Amino acid sequence: MKIYLLGAANPETIRMIRAIQRSTPNAEFPGYHDNDPKKKNSDFYGFPVLGGLEMVGGLASSDVGFVNLITGSTRARYETSRQIVAAGGQLANFIHPSIDLTMTSIGVGNYLQEAVVIQAEVEIGDNTSMHMAAIIGYESQIGSSVFIAHAVSVSGSCTIGDGTFVGTNATILPRVKIGNWATIGAGAVVTKDVPDYAVVVGNPGRIIKFIEMPFVDGKVS
């Protein structure tokens, strides 16, 4: 399958491409797409930047997948992936080959960096991103269009709803349920359930406000 990557910004994706190609020699990565017109026809660490989302429809086929690399905003990631699917593109997983996914369930369009740990009986939806050294404890359920930042620790039997953003080094204690489109601040320690749209910071985590979002869920297809 040919895999096109959307978002020519993070050089770590180049190392992931090389790792995937070492483990799967027939994996093809023709280049990147980026909506910044200044990047069109430029070079990103040896890979061409071909254009923006407008090219998806012309490239879409059964043997072509698209990877959304947007991670800074779960809302932007959700909307961009919806546009890819609406244009006829199919989302592909971009997962570092060192990650053990046995005894887990994972959807499509997910982006998991090196050193992510996914324990047994974890379920992950679609269009979710996890950065380096995040740990997802056993029997946890992670929704769609979720972002898990570097060094986040999600304990066993937790639930994280669609569209939720979990900041760097946050800790989610066992059996905690976090709703949809919530925001967990960097370094927060979440000790109890969090409702939809809540913003949580501190240790122990406390709700400081709510942000209304116009989405029921984070599903993209």
What name fits each language-model region?
Residues K38-D100:
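Phosphate-bearing ligand-interacting subdomains
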Residues L5-G7, H33, L69:
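Short hydrophobic segments within beta-strands
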Residues F94-V201, G205-I208:
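Structural signal for interior beta-strand "rungs" in well-ordered beta-sheet cores
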Residues K2-Y4, F29-P30, D63-F66:
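Short active-site oxyanion
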Residues A19-N26:
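A short, Lys/Arg-enriched amphipathic alpha-helix followed by its capping loop at the start of a domain
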Residues V201-S221:
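…primarily DNA-binding HTH/wHTH and HhH modules…
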Residues N26-D43:
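NAD(P)-binding Rossmann-fold cofactor-contacting core
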Residues M1-A19:
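Glycine-rich adenosine-cofactor-binding loop
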